[in-house]
């Protein structure tokens, strides 16, 4: 195909992606997302034409910038970065052009400036040292051993077998296994060596002879050249002013050593013309498939992810921790019971210095510390400290927050937890996330070495043919997915459209032959999402205290999307009560007393207490429309706003209204709505309540007389509590400031975050 034909084909595909992004057509929802995938496949089949697609994408980006078409900037920019990560032979002027464009976006508000900064950092490294992005991505995602680049990533795919059908689970598992059986460590190392040499040498690289040599090499030889290539790239990339010429000389030495001088001398123009540039695939990440059947399964899998790398040097403090985390927690403080005078310690004590040391020559009286506490960074308990400083996001192949929370301990592991399902699955994820954060306050095990990233792909039950869509989808189980699609158009086009393809895959007969190359659409979309979805949206978790008796302690639980309340069937009236005094309305609903803090735009506290008769109420934490998205409901950074700024419940109460007319009394129902950050509800008569959390029938609480809902606070450690009590002795003002904990926010990664 001629270059003009290829350019025209690429141009049509890019325009189709933009049309789908700007004017989504619900009638073609089953085919949405295919244009982006087919565009990437065209480049993979003809990698020598990658520079043509790069020019087209840059032209469309500059056009969108001039016409203020911000809706398409982030999708085009992420598509460009995906192409540049895989491609070789891109002219240097295109890298500089892309880098300059990203620097201009830094003047725009978030999320454009945030995504542009992330892309600019990667482009600067790739321009100086071609092949860096590809190499780091493969090493991290495939868990290849490298001392110079020790970062490791893993994708944990969690599916609840009670919410997702067995056919969907088996179809996904077979597709993942079929792709990963072709991604052996030897194949990945061959890809890294071949890509690095082609990216550095360009047309001077004899690709045919290189690939034949790599295929014939033993594992020992392959590992030798793999480590040589990694060392050459990482050493140059770590320099303050990388020299592209020096990098080229090192890669030429490796190339000549691998092929030998005789082969390199025979490399002539005729060989170059006959040697078509081969496609070097970028392997999909290492994915593990899990059926979520245990409440502690997420914690256990994360701990097992860290254990194989136990040879990494850790601080003495972390070495003392129990990595499994299943034994009793050790105390964070050691309280001395002696007099505090070193001379009074008994002989043989472990705290006595060696007699030959110089410490014995010091004064006989020395104070010993009465309390020895472990000191953590002041903000590591906050959600932002799990992912590094706010505003700094992950680079490809390197997990976010890759600095050191503790001296000598680097966060070289990234766990990408991907859940499939509906809102009920997200409620289960919220429970696991809360338990994990609470456990970390007692045993600081995962946080210093692990960057946790959460992803969500909606998988909803198919609609019944011939049934009303509204009737077949009650209760609505995809509210959070709809919200993510409204605030992030690229998430809507890429991820929300994946559900029909997954259901279609489950209906197809299984293909058990894994020997031939597969071209999996679903796995490719998952790979694109976990690589490019770096911008989190933080959701407020809510704690609910449930009382079945006012004289007993409440049961506590959390929810993410919804709490639904129904009135249970009425019990028999108490003896002595007069049936004559029971009106018609006595059998409808229950008398409820509600006390809530009304949410106002001014954020001024206003407490409201009201009593009414109602048949039920619903508390929703997800905004229903675009007008509510642009308000103060959600925030894209855990430190961007206070809890009152980014937490708001939408309460709908079905109230029983009594009216009188000439025909007599009549009772109707009306729905009242209001917004609040916390609420307390108590039944005033003999009617009991039933609560459903996150639309999950397994999380049902019956015979409830009272419940209280408020933003879930960040779990607090004993160290923080002792610090708070110490500060309280200095004054009441300090106590007031320290008593209010921060709210616990759960991040879900998207492509752009919230676009206002």
From Swiss-Prot:
A GO biological process held by the record: positive regulation of MAP kinase activity
Regions of compositional bias (Polar residues) in chain numbering: 717-731
UniProt superkingdom: Eukaryota
InterPro entries in UniProt: PIK3R5/6
Known tissue expression: Highly expressed in heart. In a lower extent, also expressed in brain, spleen, lung, liver, kidney, prostate, thyroid, salivary gland, dendritic cells, macrophages and neutrophils.
Molecular function GO terms recorded: 1-phosphatidylinositol-3-kinase regulator activity
Gene Ontology, cellular component aspect: cytoplasm; membrane; phosphatidylinositol 3-kinase complex, class IB; plasma membrane
Subcellular location: Cytoplasm; Cell membrane
Pfam families found in the cross-reference section: PI3K_1B_p101 (PF10486)
Residue numbers spanned by region Disordered: 570-589, 716-738
Main localization (coarse): cytoplasm
Entry keyword Membrane: yes
Membrane topology annotation: Peripheral membrane protein
Keyword set, alphabetical order: Angiogenesis, Cell membrane, Cytoplasm, Membrane
Summary of subunit composition and partner proteins: Heterodimer of a catalytic subunit (PIK3CG) and a regulatory (PIK3R6) subunit. The binding of PIK3R6 to PIK3CG may exclude the binding of PIK3R5 to PIK3CG. Interacts with beta-gamma G protein dimers. Interacts with PDE3B and RAPGEF3; form a signaling complex that regulates phosphatidylinositol 3-kinase gamma in angiogenesis.
Role, per record: Regulatory subunit of the PI3K gamma complex. Acts as an adapter to drive activation of PIK3CG by beta-gamma G protein dimers. The PIK3CG:PIK3R6 heterodimer is much less sensitive to beta-gamma G proteins than PIK3CG:PIK3R5 and its membrane recruitment and beta-gamma G protein dimer-dependent activation requires HRAS bound to PIK3CG. Recruits of the PI3K gamma complex to a PDE3B:RAPGEF3 signaling complex involved in angiogenesis; signaling seems to involve RRAS.
PANTHER family with a match to the protein in the record: PHOSPHATIDYLINOSITOL 3-KINASE REGULATORY SUBUNIT, PHOSPHOINOSITIDE 3-KINASE REGULATORY SUBUNIT 6
Protein name (Swiss-Prot/TrEMBL): Phosphoinositide 3-kinase regulatory subunit 6
């Amino acid at each position: 195909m001629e270059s003009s034909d290829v350019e025209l084909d690429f141009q049509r595909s890019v325009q189709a992606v933009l049309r789908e992004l700007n004017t989504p057509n619900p009638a073609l929802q089953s085919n949405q997302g295919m244009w982006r995938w087919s565009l990437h496949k065209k480049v993979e089949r003809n990698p020598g034409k990658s520079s043509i697609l790069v020019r087209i994408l840059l032209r469309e980006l500059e056009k969108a910038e001039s016409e203020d078409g911000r809706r398409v900037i982030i999708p085009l920019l992420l598509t460009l970065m995906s192409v540049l990560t895989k491609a070789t032979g891109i002219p240097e002027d295109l890298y500089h052009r892309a880098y300059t464009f990203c620097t201009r976006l830094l003047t725009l508000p978030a999320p454009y400036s945030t995504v542009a900064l992330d892309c600019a950092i990667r482009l600067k490294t790739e321009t100086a040292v071609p092949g860096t992005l590809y190499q780091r991505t493969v090493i991290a995602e495939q868990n290849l051993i490298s001392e110079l680049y020790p970062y490791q990533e893993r994708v944990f795919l969690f599916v609840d077998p009670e919410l997702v059908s067995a056919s969907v689970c088996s179809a996904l598992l077979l597709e993942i296994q079929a792709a990963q059986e072709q991604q052996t460590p030897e194949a990945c190392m061959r890809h890294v060596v071949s890509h690095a040499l082609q990216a550095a040498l360009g047309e001077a690289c004899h690709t045919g002879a290189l690939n034949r040599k790599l295929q014939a090499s033993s594992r020992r030889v392959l590992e030798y050249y793999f480590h040589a290539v990694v060392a050459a790239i990482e050493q140059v990339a770590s320099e303050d002013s990388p020299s592209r010429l020096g990098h080229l000389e090192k890669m030429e030495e490796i190339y000549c050593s691998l092929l030998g001088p005789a082969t390199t001398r025979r490399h002539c123009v005729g060989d170059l013309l006959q040697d078509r540039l081969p496609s070097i695939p970028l392997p999909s990440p290492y994915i593990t498939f899990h059926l979520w059947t245990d409440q502690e399964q997420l914690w256990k899998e994360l701990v097992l992810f860290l254990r194989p790398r136990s040879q990494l040097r850790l601080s003495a403090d972390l070495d003392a921790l129990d990595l499994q985390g299943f034994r009793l927690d050790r105390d964070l403080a050691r309280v001395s019971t002696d007099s505090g005078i070193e001379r009074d310690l008994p002989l043989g004590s472990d705290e006595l210095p060696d007699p030959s040391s110089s410490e014995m020559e010091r004064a006989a009286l020395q104070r010993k510390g009465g309390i020895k506490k472990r000191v953590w960074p002041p903000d590591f308990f906050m959600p932002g400290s799990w992912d590094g400083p706010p505003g700094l996001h992950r680079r490809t192949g390197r997990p976010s927050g890759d600095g050191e929370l503790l001296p000598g301990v680097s966060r070289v592991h990234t766990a990408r937890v991907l859940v499939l399902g509906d809102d009920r699955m997200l409620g289960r994820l919220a429970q696991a996330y809360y338990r994990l954060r609470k456990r970390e306050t007692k045993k600081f095990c995962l946080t210093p070495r692990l960057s946790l990233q959460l992803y969500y792909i909606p998988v909803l039950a198919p609609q019944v043919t011939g049934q009303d869509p509204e009737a077949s989808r009650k209760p609505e189980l995809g509210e959070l997915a709809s919200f993510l699609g409204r605030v992030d158009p690229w998430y809507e086009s890429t991820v929300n459209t994946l559900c029909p393809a997954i259901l279609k895959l489950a209906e197809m007969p299984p293909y058990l032959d894994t020997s031939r190359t597969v071209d999996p659409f679903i796995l490719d979309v998952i790979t694109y999402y976990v690589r490019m979805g770096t911008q989190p949206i933080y959701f407020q978790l809510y704690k609910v205290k449930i009382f079945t008796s006012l004289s007993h302690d409440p049961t506590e639980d959390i929810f993410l999307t919804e709490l639904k309340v129904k009135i249970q069937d009425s019990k028999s009236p108490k003896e002595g009560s007069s049936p004559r005094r029971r009106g018609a309305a006595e059998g409808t609903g229950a008398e409820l007393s509600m006390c809530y803090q009304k949410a106002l735009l001014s954020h001024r506290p206003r407490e409201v207490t009201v009593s009414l008769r109602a048949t039920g109420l619903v508390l929703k934490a997800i905004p229903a429309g675009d007008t509510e998205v642009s308000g103060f409901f959600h925030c894209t950074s855990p430190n961007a706003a206070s809890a009152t700024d980014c937490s708001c419940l939408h309460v709908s109460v079905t109230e029983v209204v009594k009216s009188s007319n000439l025909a007599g009394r009549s009772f109707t129902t009306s729905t009242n709505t209001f917004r609040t950050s916390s609420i307390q509800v108590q039944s005033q008569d003999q009617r009991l309540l039933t609560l459903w959390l996150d639309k999950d029938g397994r999380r049902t609480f019956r015979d409830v007389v009272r419940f209280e809902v408020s933003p879930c606070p960040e779990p607090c450690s004993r160290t923080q509590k002792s610090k708070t009590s110490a500060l309280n002795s200095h004054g009441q003002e300090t106590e007031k400031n320290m008593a209010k904990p921060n709210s616990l926010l759960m991040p879900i990664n998207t492509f752009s975050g919230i676009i206002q």
